[in-house]
UniProtKB/Swiss-Prot annotation:
Keywords: Cell cycle, Cell division, Chromosome, Coiled coil, Meiosis, Nucleus
Gene Ontology BP, a term: positive regulation of developmental process
Effect of P53Q: Promotes formation of higher-order homooligomers
Keyword RNA-binding tagged: no
One protein family per Pfam: Synaptonemal_3
Disulfide-linked positions: none
Official protein name in the record: Synaptonemal complex central element protein 3
Major localisation: nucleus
Any one Gene Ontology cellular component term annotated for this protein: chromosome
Species assigned in the record: Homo sapiens (Human)
Length: 88
């Protein structure tokens, strides 16, 4: 019986960790969806501004925004992986 108690706690901890991980992944997915919508609107704006002489500047801003978004998502993903490994 004494052996079952730590195993049960370990199982409960694992379930909580998986639940927390699932919530974190859902939050990241929601953020990625928001970013995708923003990128879609930015792309739409670029098409609308096609004849605008400032197209090159707008493209540079779009690229900068994409790179910043990508870096932030990679950073968040690495932090999440690191936290998950620490819990194990």
């Amino acid at each position: 019986m004494d052996d079952a108690d730590p195993e049960e706690r370990n199982y409960d901890n694992m379930l909580k960790m998986l639940s927390d991980l699932n919530k974190d992944l859902e939050k990241l997915l929601e953020e990625m969806e928001k970013i995708s919508v923003q990128a879609t609107w930015m792309a739409y704006d670029m098409v609308v501004m096609r004849t605008n002489p400032t197209l090159a500047e707008s493209m540079r801003r779009l690229e900068d925004a994409f790179v910043n978004c990508k870096e932030e998502m990679e950073k968040n993903w690495q932090e999440l992986l690191h936290e998950t490994k620490q819990r194990l």
